[in-house]
Amino acid sequence: MGGLKKPKKKYLEGKPKKIWNKQLLLEELQLVGEYGLRNKKELWLARAHLKWIVRRARSLLSMTPEERAPLELPFKEKLYKMGFIEDPNVPLDRILSLDVRAILERRLQTIVYRKGLAKSIYHARQLVVHGHVAVAGRRVTSPGFLVPRDLEDKITLIE
């Protein structure tokens, strides 16, 4: 009969422990500018997603080869379909070396800019938020939408 539960923040895994570390602040500022993020929470969300991937790869590495075999290929195929890795046959050690840029490169805002549909990364964000971008014929208004590899060439501008 109590009140509603407070929703859990999705970026806590990616939030740095020491937020006033000068080196970290400069690195975050550079990433926010390079990828046109609105605030650091978007960067922390990407870091949290990366942390989930690395944690899953680490747990697979800790298993015996017999336990790992049925779980490893689907995990790698999922990462390949999302575009985080270039080949589904890469070793798990390479997955551990992914960085946050791999996640940020798959955002709709970044892909719209990289394809040349926008003049700048900020223009790409505005196009997405205002509903001028469609992915596979469906309007997407979230610049943080992670575009799978098979939908990457189906991004179009709509009026």
UniProtKB/Swiss-Prot annotation:
Residues passing through the membrane, by range: none
Residue intervals of the S4 RNA-binding domain: 106-158
GO molecular function: rRNA binding; structural constituent of ribosome
Function summary: One of the primary rRNA binding proteins, it binds directly to 16S rRNA where it nucleates assembly of the body of the 30S subunit. With S5 and S12 plays an important role in translational accuracy.
CDD domains: S4
Gene source species: Pyrobaculum islandicum (strain DSM 4184 / JCM 9189 / GEO3)
Family per record: Belongs to the universal ribosomal protein uS4 family.
Keyword Transcription regulation: no
InterPro entries on file: Ribosomal_uS4, Ribosomal_uS4_arc, Ribosomal_uS4_CS, Ribosomal_uS4_euk/arc, Ribosomal_uS4_N, S4_RNA-bd, S4_RNA-bd_sf
GO CC list: small ribosomal subunit
Subunit and interaction comment: Part of the 30S ribosomal subunit. Contacts protein S5. The interaction surface between S4 and S5 is involved in control of translational fidelity.
Keyword Ribonucleoprotein: yes
Gene3D superfamilies to which the protein is assigned, alphabetical: RNA-binding S4 domain
Residues spanning the signal sequence: none
Protein name: Small ribosomal subunit protein uS4
Keyword line: Ribonucleoprotein, Ribosomal protein, RNA-binding, rRNA-binding
